[in-house]
Amino acid sequence: MTIDKYHHSHQNVADKLVREYEGPTPFALYLKTYFAANKKHGSKDRKSISAICYEYFRKLSEAFPLRNFISSSIDIPKFTASHLQQPLLFIRARPGKKELVKASLEKAGLFFESIGEMTFALPNTSSLQNIIVLNKEAVIQDINSQALASLLKLIPLTEKPLVVWDPCAASGGKSILIKDTMPSVQLHVSDIRENILFNCEKRLKEAGIQPASLQVVDITLPFAIKKQFDFIFADLPCSGSGTWGRTPENLQAYTEAQLNTMTKLQENILHHLMPAIKIGGYLLAATCSVYKNENEDQIEKLVATGKFKLIAQQYFIGYDKHADTLFGALLQKMAD
């Protein structure tokens, strides 16, 4: 078969896959299921078909959903245009491991760029298997997720270890960031999903981190507060609109109704977390969204209660770095 015929064949398969995709299954899993059921596609076929599919979704960025809800801090033309290119793969070297990680990448002959003190950027398709010991030597973490450490550093440490809670632990990346940035803290970890928490525990163990507690907690509902914390790092559920360069299928149809549902969920979570913070303690609220409703508006509501003072907030811009765009705000609790 000629190159043109190969491309035409792949284009036809990709067109069919895109037409039949209805969500909510992540498109990457949808593709994986299709390829598992159609063994005729070899490795090169799979890569070509996948690339054509994702190129289609990236072109949808010209009609990025709910543009009128995007924060004024975002340069919309630059942000939407960034979806035409695949984001980079970022890794963060653990404390004391940068030179080891750099040497390992060089030995493997991988193309990479060293950024700042601890970060390396690689092409998204790079494989790190058998090159570095993930979680022990370095963690895969977007450069702007790493940048949230700049807000962590605004929290004053005391002689007595701070009692810290990561209530939306997911895969454990934030917990590792907390311990790498604030080594002395007493870290408590939870998530609503037991299976996710199991994987989180495994990852923390690989990172050499033993949390003070690790348990399933549903913070979308009222819960018994057995003790208050010096600091809570709430990575709030959100639209994920700052990361759609990695999952461009989401550009297809995200609605105002979905955004409203998400903001109400965020409000519930923040309402339930507020009493769990000591007076004088801190809350770091973060999202991977570019929508003002999920970010500045939520922070304004917290400040309006009279119970919190805003210390700092910012968008961590990714469209100039081939990275995700995140939002973070650090607040101090002033009253119950």
What are these regions (language model features)?
Residues 1-336:
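S-adenosylmethionine
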